[in-house]
Regions:
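Asp-box/WD-like beta-propeller blade repeats and closely related beta-sheet repeat scaffolds
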Residues: 31-101
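Residue-level detector of Asp-centered blade-edge/turn motifs that repeat once per structural unit
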Residues: 3-7, 49-50, 106-107, 154-156
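Acidic, glycine-rich loop-and-beta core segments that form the ion-binding/anion-interacting portion
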Residues: 138-184
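Short loop/turn segments immediately following beta-strands, especially the blade-tip
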Residues: 21-28, 66-76, 124-132, 172-182
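Structural signal for beta-propeller blades
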Residues: 18-20, 62-65, 119-121, 167-169
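Short loop/turn segments immediately following the C-termini of beta-strands
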Residues: 15, 59, 69, 116-117, ...
């Protein structure tokens, strides 16, 4: 689930898409609408800094999906969807892409897609004029590290792996992610 930037709407994953609910003063939820994401069920949601897009991570199909959102809370059309390709290094993950987490950088310039299956973080630019995700960089994580979640704060960017290590940077610009160092 994810909450809109204004706190009025709750986004949720459904079998083949995403739904949005309006939160009333009592905390009750009323469904507004839903959209199909043209892929398998997502596993992680986030919104951009401006609240104009909903990002969906697809673990089962390795897909990153972007959905337009409207000021009145409605979900709009699909902006773009990108399937990751490649082979991973851990047999238990079936050697294929599994997008675990999608989150925009704090400056809203890039979308980071953490892929547990292929040990990578793909960094996209959201081209709002062309309605496309454009791959601008790839952070290749150590083999079998299983990156899971990326998180940002004002001072630190964290990339969390399969419960055994964390990569940390004092830089908030993910384009400098290559300078991350592994901490055990």
């Amino acid at each position: 689930m994810a909450v809109s930037k204004n706190g009025k709407y709750l986004y949720s994953i459904e079998d083949e898409g995403v739904a949005v609910f309006k939160r009333d003063k009592n905390g009750d939820l009323s469904r507004i609408n839903s959209v199909n994401i043209d892929g398998m069920r997502g596993c992680f949601l986030s919104t951009d800094v401006d609240g104009k897009y909903l990002y969906v991570a697809g673990y089962h199909d390795g897909k990153v999906t972007v959905v337009h959102t409207h000021k009145d809370g409605r979900l709009g059309s699909l902006m773009d969807g990108v399937f990751h390709t490649g082979l991973g290094s851990v047999a238990e993950r079936n050697f294929r892409p599994h997008v675990n987490c999608v989150r925009p950088t704090p400056d809203n310039k890039y979308l980071c897609a953490v892929d547990n299956g292929i040990d990578q973080v793909k960094i996209y630019r959201v081209n709002k004029l062309r309605n496309k995700l454009e791959l601008v960089d790839i952070l290749r994580c150590p083999r079998e590290s299983g990156p899971r979640i990326i998180s940002f704060s004002m001072m630190v960017s964290l990339l969390i792996f399969s419960l055994n290590s964390v990569m940390r940077s004092g830089l908030t610009n993910m384009m400098e992610a290559v300078r991350f160092r592994r901490l055990n």
